[in-house]
């Protein structure tokens, strides 16, 4: 069930990312189209598209969706070691996506900071969408990192402790090794985003 919920979240974020991609192409093809899409909007679309597709879409689809289905199946476990932690992890990611979507409706719109998201660049650059848009984006990142860390630890413990009898680490399928390695690398990178977001907030 959690895997299906992750897939549905990935579909939703993918649709939002697709719409933002169309709007960016519209701005590039017809600059300043009737004043509907300005340069500021373009920067906001680029930033949000990158965040949604790279962080939320790919993680929800491959690690959340396929990981929840493939890991127990391939290691011979009935389910993840901590199913309730798995459920809590999903809902934290879901709330993170909801908070990020809320930044579209605040005054000034979502952040358009790009790579100047973190201080002191945000203050110096005066980027579009600064203020509430950036704060909502960073709160969303913080929730996502906490939820993903909980889910990642659950994945790792399942792979290391819930394998079927006779399955050594050397006999594990390469797909499990791939998901395990990607989870470890992501868990090394995402806490840095969390620390920077907490410093900003």
State each model region's role:
Residues 9-18, 89-107, 181-195:
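Hydrophobic alpha-helical membrane-insertion segments
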Residues 47-59, 127-148:
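Hydrophobic alpha-helical transmembrane segments
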Residues 1-2, 18-40, 44, 61-89, ...:
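Membrane-interfacial helix termini and the short, flexible loops that connect transmembrane helices
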Residues 51-60, 82-96:
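Hydrophobic alpha-helical transmembrane segments in multi-pass integral membrane proteins
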Residues 199-201:
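Conserved small/polar residues in nucleotide/adenosyl-binding loops
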Residues 137-154, 188-197:
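Hydrophobic transmembrane alpha-helices and their helix-loop junctions in integral membrane proteins
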């Amino acid at each position: 069930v959690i895997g299906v919920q992750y897939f549905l979240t990935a579909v939703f974020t993918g649709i939002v990312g697709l719409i933002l991609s169309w709007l960016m192409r519209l701005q590039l093809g017809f600059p300043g189209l009737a004043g509907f899409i300005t340069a500021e909007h373009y920067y906001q679309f680029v930033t949000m598209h990158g965040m949604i597709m790279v962080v939320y879409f790919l993680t929800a689809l491959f690690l959340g969706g396929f990981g929840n289905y493939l890991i127990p199946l391939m290691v011979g476990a009935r389910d993840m070691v901590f199913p309730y932690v798995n459920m809590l992890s999903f809902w934290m990611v879901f709330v993170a996506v909801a908070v990020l979507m809320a930044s579209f409706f605040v005054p000034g719109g979502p952040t358009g900071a790009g790579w100047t998201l973190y201080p002191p660049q945000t203050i110096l650059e005066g980027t579009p969408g600064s203020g509430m848009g950036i704060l909502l984006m960073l709160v969303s990142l913080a929730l996502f990192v906490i939820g993903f860390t909980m889910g990642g630890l659950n994945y790792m413990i399942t792979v290391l402790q819930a394998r079927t009898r006779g399955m050594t680490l050397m006999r594990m399928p390469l797909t499990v090794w791939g998901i395990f390695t990607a989870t470890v690398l992501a868990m090394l990178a995402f806490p840095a985003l969390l620390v920077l977001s907490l410093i900003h907030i």
